[in-house]
């Protein structure tokens, strides 16, 4: 996603690109993300529901819990740290749908901090005078994008066949 920081993989050759694409298709690539989400996420959990284009706005995705539209999507999440009005979580994807983490977290009432497409900026723009209002305005100045990091990426090397695992640190704007 645009404005997501962290790791990504590219195939340098057609062979590598094809091999990596197959690994993503077969869901053997390990991907974990860190996200700051609104609210106190009380428990670790799993969000499961079809994800597809929203009926009212075709530029965003929506969750269809009965599976009437979209494609099957599963996101596992665990709480890393509670930080007042936001919670730092880790997400592990079983599937890889467009905006999957963003739409799944919105669906369970915990949109990503700073995500205007999925309700992550409403806490400031929609609640003037709130308890954390000045603090949050400063946070939006420091982190003017969705708080989502591609934290770990693991896959089999296309030529050597060995499993490779990469890890990235939280960017400075998410640490502040």
State where each predicted segment sits:
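RNA pseudouridine synthases
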Residues: 2-176
């Amino acid at each position: 996603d645009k404005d997501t920081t962290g790791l990504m993989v590219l195939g340098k050759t057609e062979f590598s690109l094809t091999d990596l694409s197959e690994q993503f298709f077969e869901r053997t690539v390990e991907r974990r993300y860190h996200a700051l989400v609104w609210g106190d996420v009380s428990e670790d959990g799993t969000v499961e529901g079809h994800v597809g284009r929203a009926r009212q706005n075709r530029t965003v995705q929506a969750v269809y819990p009965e599976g009437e539209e979209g494609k099957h999507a599963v996101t596992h999440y665990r709480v890393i740290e509670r930080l007042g009005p936001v919670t730092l979580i880790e997400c592990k994807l079983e599937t890889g749908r467009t905006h999957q983490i963003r739409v799944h977290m919105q669906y369970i009432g915990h949109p990503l901090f700073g995500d205007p497409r999925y309700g992550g900026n409403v806490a400031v723009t929609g609640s003037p005078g709130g308890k954390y209002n000045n603090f949050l305005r400063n946070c939006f100045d420091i982190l003017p994008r969705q708080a989502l990091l591609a934290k770990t990426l693991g896959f089999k090397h296309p030529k050597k066949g060995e499993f490779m695992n990469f890890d990235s640190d939280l960017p400075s704007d998410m640490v502040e």
